Structure formats: structure tokens, C-alpha cells
Amino acid sequence: VPVRWIDQGAVGALIIARVPYRQLAGLIEVDLKRIFADRTNWRAMLKLVPPHHQALMEARERARVHLREELQPYLLPDEVPLDLVYPVLAYPPKITSVSLEKTPEVSGRLLGAKGQYLIFEDGRVLNIRNHSGFHVAVEDPEAVV
């Protein structure tokens, strides 16, 4: 499963094509951009949502119908949907994004990670990708030294 899908917090995945080189993947992606949105609603992604296998199968069929004929041979009609599971103990009912630029110290009980986000017990979430280059220290107050 591509890291990109995990970064976006996908709960289900279905590989629809396999190509011998990257340029073909780009051509398929350009065709599919016309019918599929390429934006992730980060708030919705941080909720517990079960995978929708039927929706993935229907999306594969839409892709098949809209893909240019010369790209059709690369489609994989028999792949089965995969479930992606993240290490999250619980999902808070309400979430609030926190930034290390505005709040340089973040503390609290970590419930898990999903996609690019760390999820804290109080509903705060931290987008790790937005903080590339930051130096952070992680401490466990219960650790015995």
C-alpha cells in the first residue's frame, strides 16, 4: 500500500492498476483526477470510520469506464479491498488542531496516530508533516530512569 494513502488516513484501499513505469501511472492519475476528488477532509479523517468495500469496488468501475482505452490493459479487475488499521486507542468526539509555532509545548496523553496526525486524549491533534524541521522531545512521565 502506498505511503501516500496511509498519510491521508485511508481506512480502505483498492489497487486498481499496475504499470511498468512511473510515466504511465501519471497518465492514469491525470485521467482519474477528472472524476475523483484529490482532497482529504482532515477532520473527517480523524474519526473512526469503517472501510466501505462496496464504494471502493464502485469507484474501480467508474475508473474503468472513464480511463482512456490505451490505459485499460493496466487495470486490475480482480484485486480485493484492503483494510488499513491505525494505532489509535480511541477517537475523541471533537478535535482541535494545534501548531507548535503558536503552542511551543504540547503535553498530554497520546491516544494514537492516524495519517499524518498525532491524536491526544483531550481532542487536540498535531499534524506532523506541518512541523518538518522542528526539533521535538518526547517524554514519558511514568518512565523509570
Give the location of each predicted region.
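GIY-YIG-like beta-to-alpha core
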Residues: 1-11
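OB-fold and OB-like beta-barrel modules that bind single-stranded nucleic acids
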Residues: 1, 108-110
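Short aromatic-glycine-enriched beta-strand elements
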Residues: 116-120
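Short glycine-rich, low-complexity segments
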Residues: 11-105, 112, 124-145
